[in-house]
Amino acid sequence: GIEAGKTLWLGLELVHQPEWHTYWRNPGDAGVGISLNWTLPAGAKLGAMRWPVPEKLVVAGLMNHVFNGDHALLLPVAIPKDLAPGTRLPIRAEAQWLACTDKICVPERGTLALDLTVGDGAVTPADRARFDAWRAKLALPLGGQALFQRDGTRMRIAVPLPASVSATDPWFFAETEDAIAYAAPQKAERVGDRSIVETEARGSEADRLTGVL
């Protein structure tokens, strides 16, 4: 059930057939991430969608940011506080996404529908475990702000990462489009409580760079 005045979390699970993949919010050199056009009840407000950490897939020299297996996108919805128990809340979305193998791509679309009822906000143990498993695949927020510097065709990114946290072959997935060359090699080194990633810059100089390490 859902509770008036609280935040409801929606989970959109994408189930993949073997050898098929879909794309992250920044798909990389090719592909398209999922798009959702929502219709929500009056007064409800949708927050930013939370994505799992993607995987790298290089095809014909092009870097793709993909999901090779089943995964879920999480979306917070603020529910109006003046709703009486028993109020019905219809949630609808028109979805479009691209599903690919290493040989073909198929544009997909679908209509999503969910009818909820305002109640006491109780969550079943099974649903809680399911959402906990999905949240475990999200990127964790940094303890501080990352820094970046562009020098000609090179980009250096300093990501806060405590020395006590191990990192094997880290890779920076840029959310900001056209800031780095996605398929270019990345060199990473630890300097104190930071992981320094150096790679090839691309496009015009950006004043903001976001991503996932």
Protein language model regions, located:
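Extracellular/lumen-exposed scaffold segments
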Residues: 1-213
